[in-house]
Each structure stands twice: as structure tokens, then as C-alpha cells.
């Protein structure tokens, strides 16, 4: 049976995406908002470490879905100019409605490859997107991302870690609507994808080591970032 295009799958569930996501991550003990916000906090922490957290930077949110990251991006990094794209027309509709009060935020539908902006970006933010992209299309997508970065720019790319038992259990048990055709990406594969696309200085960090009922241990997570068993991981990769 031919797989349904992901754009159509996400169109169908755009209005109920948050409900489905809540069910999918229930075993973690956290709400989806926790995961949306933590990713932005990681970006903020990195920008602060290089003294750029207050700069007026151009950010592309590649695969923005229903726009759950934008309010946190503007909360922690209010000077950002945000351009957000997604393959799902209905998800973009929901994202525009949910974020209509935010300034300097633009949403556009795209085909997954041709990024619909003429200018280049300081940051490209990719939150758990690439495991939805068919393997045969991932290199072309990553190369398109590379070509849209300024020479001084970087991407921050988050993925689910298939080595983590809770992540794997959630993926197997939930097999939920918009994720059933995806394939989790191991960190080594992602590094090879980035290197093949000409990215340099790839830095990896592992995150989310404790479920909700052990959240009092969260303060220790910053010391565990090298352990390859976190539920999520992310790469920061530079163009040069």
C-alpha cells in the first residue's frame, strides 16, 4: 500500500495535533509544552554563551507544525525575526491563528525543499522534523537548509534518541497518527548527514534524562550531556 504523503497526514490532524501529541508523550510525565520550551531554552543558552542572545537575528523554523515554538522563541529571544515554514497547509493555518499576536513572525507553506524566502538566515531551528522526512529526501532537504544559512550562521537540529528506552517504548506503543510512517534517526546517522551536506564543527548534546516523576533531578542534566542515553539529542552545526 502506498504511503500517504506527510503533508496530507498533517493536514488531517492539524486541528487535533496537540491532543495527539499529549497522548504520545504521556508516559514521559510531561506535557508537550515542556518539550517545546526546553528546546528554545537550549538555543537561548547557546546564544548567551556566545554573546548573541540580545541581537536581532533572522531565524528560520524549518517544519514549524502548528506553531508551538514561536511563543517561546519570542519569550526568550524577543529580538528574533522569525520565518516559519511547514509542508502542511492546515498546520500553517493553525500556526497563524495561534500566533497572531506575535510581532516579526511569518508563516509560509512550502514543499519541503524550496525554502520560500530570498534572504539567508543566522539560525535554522529544526525541532524533531527529520525523522518525518523519507530517507531518500533527507540529503536534499539538508543541503537546501545549508544553502539558506549565512556564512556565519548555524543550525540547531533536535531529534528523538532511539537508544533511550522510554523514547523507543513511546514510539512503539503509540504508533500514533502523524508519526506512524517515520523512522527515528540515530545520532551517528545525523552527523553523517550533516557532514555530507558540508556542515562544519558539529557539536552534539543529549538531553532529557529523567521522566516527570523524577523532575527534581533535572538540575543535574546539564552535567550529563555527553551520555548518549538522553531521550532527545541535538546538534549545533556551523556553515564554516
Where are these regions (language model features)?
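Short alpha-helix
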Residues: 183-198
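A short glycine-rich, Lys/Arg-flanked "PGG" loop and its adjoining helix->strand segment in the class I
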Residues: 139-151
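Short, glycine-/aromatic-enriched active-site segment of Class I SAM-dependent methyltransferases
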Residues: 162-180
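N-terminal, positively charged/glycine-rich alpha-helical extensions of SAM-dependent methyltransferases
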Residues: 1-25
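Class I SAM-dependent methyltransferase SAM/SAH-binding core
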Residues: 60, 66-113
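Conserved alpha-helix/loop element of class I SAM-dependent methyltransferases that forms part
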Residues: 35-55, 72
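Conserved beta-strand signature within the Rossmann-like core of class I S-adenosyl-L-methionine
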Residues: 152-159
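A conserved beta-strand element that flanks and buttresses the S-adenosyl-L-methionine
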Residues: 125
Amino acid at each position: 500500500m502506498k504511503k500517504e504523503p506527510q503533508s496530507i497526514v498533517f493536514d488531517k490532524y492539524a486541528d487535533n495535533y496537540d491532543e495527539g501529541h499529549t497522548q504520545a508523550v504521556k508516559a514521559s510525565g510531561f506535557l508537550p509544552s515542556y518539550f517545546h520550551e526546553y528546546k528554545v531554552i537550549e538555543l537561548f543558552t547557546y546564544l548567551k554563551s556566545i554573546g548573541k542572545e540580545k541581537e536581532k537575528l533572522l531565524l528560520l523554523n524549518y517544519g514549524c507544525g502548528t506553531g508551538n515554538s514561536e511563543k517561546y522563541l519570542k519569550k526568550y529571544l524577543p529580538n528574533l525575526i522569525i520565518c516559519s515554514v511547514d509542508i502542511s497547509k492546515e498546520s500553517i493555518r493553525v500556526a497563524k491563528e495561534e500566533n497572531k499576536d506575535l510581532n516579526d513572525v511569518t508563516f509560509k507553506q512550502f514543499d519541503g525543499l524550496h525554502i520560500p524566502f530570498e534572504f539567508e538566515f543566522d539560525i535554522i531551528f529544526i525541532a524533531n522534523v527529520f525523522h518525518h522526512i523519507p530517507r531518500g529526501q533527507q540529503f536534499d532537504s539538508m543541503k537546501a537548509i545549508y544553502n539558506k544559512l549565512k556564512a556565519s550562521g548555524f543550525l540547531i537540529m533536535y531529534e528523538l534518541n532511539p537508544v533511550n528506552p522510554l523514547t523507543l517504548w513511546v514510539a512503539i506503543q503509540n504508533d500514533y497518527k502523524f508519526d506512524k510512517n517515520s523512522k527515528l534517526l540515530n545520532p551517528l546517522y545525523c552527523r553523517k548527514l550533516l557532514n555530507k551536506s558540508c556542515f562544519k564543527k558539529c557539536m552534539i548534546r543529549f538531553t532529557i534524562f529523567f521522566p516527570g516523576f523524577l523532575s527534581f533531578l533535572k538540575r543535574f542534566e546539564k552535567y550529563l550531556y555527553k551520555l548518549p542515553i538522553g531521550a532527545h539529542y541535538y546538534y549545533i552545526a556551523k556553515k564554516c
